[in-house]
């Protein structure tokens, strides 16, 4: 009955879908991301509702958050928008992307991985070479 009411409200455009939610496996790895209701719509805790419905841990994520910065100037939410394969860190309340290379380090403020040395900023294109632990120029 409740789900039918929600569907009727959606079809009548009285209720808008705007929030995003990540579902986690038992190791806090993101296995799915959906679009859903805004927290508080109809007085419901949607994180809890979606989690119980699927039998998984569910965490809201912000499409506009990357590197602990909100694109529209709002408050950043959980450091980064969740993607499949990201890890949810409950101590930091953050989504962390997969580590791209063994030598890279986690920036605990942005929860993004950084190379041990900065990429040159000279207008050229580079790629990371893990064997030499250095940036290599892309020959075009």
Q: What are these model-predicted stretches?
A:
Residues 1-140:
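Interaction-interface detector
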């Amino acid at each position: 009955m409740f789900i039918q009411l929600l569907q009727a409200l959606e079809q009548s455009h009285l209720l808008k879908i705007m929030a995003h939610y990540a579902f986690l496996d038992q190791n806090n790895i993101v296995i799915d991301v959906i679009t859903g209701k805004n927290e508080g719509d109809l007085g419901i805790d949607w994180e809890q509702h979606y989690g119980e419905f699927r039998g998984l841990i569910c965490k809201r994520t912000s499409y506009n958050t990357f590197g602990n910065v909100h694109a529209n100037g709002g408050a950043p939410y959980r450091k980064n928008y969740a993607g499949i394969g990201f890890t949810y860190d409950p101590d930091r309340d953050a989504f962390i992307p997969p580590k791209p290379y063994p030598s890279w380090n986690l920036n605990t403020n942005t929860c993004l991985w950084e190379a041990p040395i900065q990429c040159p900023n000279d207008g050229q294109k580079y790629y990371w070479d893990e064997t030499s632990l250095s940036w290599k120029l892309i020959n075009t």
